[in-house]
Amino acid sequence: MGKIIGIDLGTTNSCVAVLENGQPKVIENSEGARTTPSVVAYMEDGEILVGAPAKRQAVTNAKNTIFASKRLIGRRFEEKEVQKDIDLMPFSIVKADNGDAWIDVRGKKLAPPQISAEVLRKMKKTAEDYLGEEVTEAVITVPAYFNDSQRQATKDAGRIAGLEVKRIINEPTAAALAFGMDKSEKGDKKIAVYDLGGGTFDISIIEIADVDGEKQFEVLATNGDTFLGGEDFDQRLIDYIVTEFKKEQGVDLKNDVMALQRLKEAAEKAKIELSSGQQTEINLPYITMDATGPKHLTMKITRAKFESLVDELIERSIEPCRVAIKDAGLKVSDIDDVILVGGQSRMPKVQEAVKTFFGKEPRRDVNPDEAVAVGAAIQGSVLSGERKDLLLLDVTPLSLGIETMGGIMTKLIQKNTTIPTKATQVFSTADDNQTAVTIHVLQGEREKAAANKSLGQFNLSDIPPAPRGLPQIEVTFDIDANGILHVSAKDKATGKQANITIQASSGLSEAEIEKMVRDAELNAEEDKKLAELVQARNQAEGLIHSVKKSLADYGDKIGSDEKARIEAAIKDAEEAVKGEDKAAIEAKSEELAKASQKLGEIMYAQAQAESQAAGEGQPDAGKKDDGNVVDAEFEEVKKDKQ
């Protein structure tokens, strides 16, 4: 059985890990980095760049470089958080036919799971290159406060990337696994995982217990905000710089996509620098121009100034902590350890706020960028049977129920219920002789049905006519270990049943997912062909260069016919290299190699003669010693050019 890898699919960065000989290993990508930017760029020629190469070209291709797409995954276009992002993002967020928020790239509408799938494919390839075998199964993490649609969309992204998602687990829970797995301290421990990432915030209260030699991780409560993260901190700084620049220069950078992209990079860098220094300078020459000429942006930002800009965001993260502790039935003083996860938790002011709230120093022995992927890999090893000393009990973050008479939400499963779980309740009809009922499934905490997230609806028909209140309709909610909901309704009189796996009232249909999987496979084939073409081109160019050099050095030692033949072969090869036909490039390279064979022989003879001439000056020149000559066959090793 192949390895089940662990993937932290982050808003800003992603990371992949695997368990080897019982130890988690974070795998470096092809650029040598342990984390990969969750950035995908769509080039004019159809090529798709992922990670650092995509991020590097963002300034010149801002409209087609997608970052933070996780903030849109499983979301409706109308949601206020999406509307807010429309004004901030350089790329175009559009309404899909099903009402979801999609992204328009070069005139083609793409679903956020398709974009996330490109990042997942890079993670899959990173693991395959390291392990030397195909990887088909993964555990993928999501923010604990993700709702059903967002979890389903993440699972879809895995499928599009060619991965069977064995389990979706919550990021703070994964971090707790990474933290608690190899801790030797005995006794129960209650920990708080404060996870402030690039786009989302989660707080989970988790109890780690030793039960008969088995480590049990039980999530007591979770809370969060799926639209609060490092991207928002960056945006506060960008807004401040734009406002100040407008005051000084009278130019509004908000309308200049390229300037904003440069500013985003600079703001992110400044934010990181301010975690260790008290002041930083943003220096962007030629940021824009007006009638008076080019404008340069130079601005000093102090740590105190930045902290004042984001103070309210940090405060926003503390309220969910209060709620989570209350929901867990604990006091702040009951928490034994606080773990910080997510890149934004490195900010000193964030650490200070966490320390003040919990009354203790957060732990420093967890890598905020890697802990989540490590935990996912540990869970993968449990699912594959490699580890048997661990039990994970997670919870559903939000209450689930159905809409009942008067537009009220009736809850069947309360938030923070341990999963997997099942709940059944009997309902009846609202009108006399009603022959059908619509089951409207909701997720959220509000009494008013319309104020909660609609997950989908389905009909149960052919109910025998009867006075209102008489028919008995049994509704069952079943949440699996991924936190994904299955709902069924049954008329107890007839036994007739209707059910759905919630794919959200929006979401991708099975046909759409399968089409995206096929497109992705097609893309992979195209990528392979492109790589082979580039390799053939590189080898041909290398040969052309070396033959040209040899011709310049030794051309006078061959006949004019021979020389003309080589020059013609060079010209043919140069023409072939300009084209897109791999077979033609290889054929013309072969012809050039044959045509230049005579030239190679002359070069070799010349080199040998020079070597002998040099050797004649040595004392033992001319002595022949065959005693230690080893017969060997030499094989030309063609090294692939990158």
From Swiss-Prot:
The modification Phosphothreonine is found at residue 200. Residues 608-642 are annotated as: Disordered. It comes from Laribacter hongkongensis (strain HLHK9). Pfam families: HSP70. This is Chaperone protein DnaK. Keywords: ATP-binding, Chaperone, Nucleotide-binding, Phosphoprotein, Stress response. Residues 608-618 have a biased composition (Low complexity). Induction: By stress conditions e.g. heat shock. Belongs to the heat shock protein 70 family. Acts as a chaperone.
